[in-house]
Amino acid sequence: VYEVFSHPEVRRYKTSICSKASLMMLFILALTFIPPLFVVYRSYGFWRKTDYYREYPDIHFKRELLLVLELQQEGNYVTYSTFQKYNQLQNEHLRVPLITSRETDTNRDGKSDSLIFNLEMPLLDSENVLGVKLILIFDYKLHQFSSLTMESIAYANYDAIKPGGKFEILGDLRVNQKEPIGYRGVDNRYNTSVIDSTSVYAESYDFINIFKSYTSRNLTTYLNAPYMVWSTGRGASQPFVISATINYAEEQFLYTPGFWYLIKWGWVQYVSVLLIFLFFFDRVKVFIYQNQLVPTMVEKPWREEKLK
């Protein structure tokens, strides 16, 4: 003899609306569905007010820069910028270098992956470079959530003991974020000039003043360049050379999620805890009504027949 098929029989418990059995069912339902909300909420992860996502920013070098080369003579320097007003202010110290730059797209995704920059500054044989201050200006865009556009910079600084003939930079353009960005809309708050090129005052082009204004932003970029090489010695009539390779890296951004993301995340957590409560209180209901701890009318799926 073997079991060929089986299925459960349904036993129904009936009662009036105003009865102990109805009140017991309401009480059990409340204990089933409400406590999971408190459990998930107290775990400090129910509503994700902020979250992270990764995006490969769209970056382009704007071919704008500000350069100061500090010379061995005390207080002496040579400089160059792409800003006409600044060049007019620095007429005595101004030198015009030879600049070449190109951006590469190695993975062919339509976005630049790196900047290869080269600058040759003509100097007199008596002029020896001991320090470099360089600001490169970029156009920085995000598209995945909010459409964000801003002007950003990469700053390189080096002070040497011995005069140099070449300064090489290898690094990444990274982002620094203070507050979350939105998940949709257009954000052009920082799409303004980092350096006020219309100003005729020397203070506007001072590095510390530029950085004070720039660092007040929520989003800024900086040059992460652990590998800087200072080569000493420069041949007669040879220029001072600055060579830089700056990679554009994928970044992680903090943002404020939308409503449906919050619902989706909260629902997943709530249901995972609710299943445990459903399983437990289902057993409680079976015990209470099967043992008639509260009076009900039992409707069985079969008829009891008296033995003859």
Regions found by a protein language model. Name each.
Residues 218-308:
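Long, compositionally biased interface segments
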Residues 38, 42, 125, 140-146, ...:
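Eukaryotic basic, amphipathic alpha-helical target segments in cytosolic regions
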Residues 20-24, 103-108, 270:
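Short, charged/polar micro-motifs that form catalytic or ligand-binding hotspots
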Residues 48-255:
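Non-cytosolic ectodomains/luminal loops of secretory-pathway membrane proteins
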Residues 1-94, 293, 297-306:
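N-terminal pre-first-transmembrane soluble regions of secretory-pathway and organelle membrane proteins
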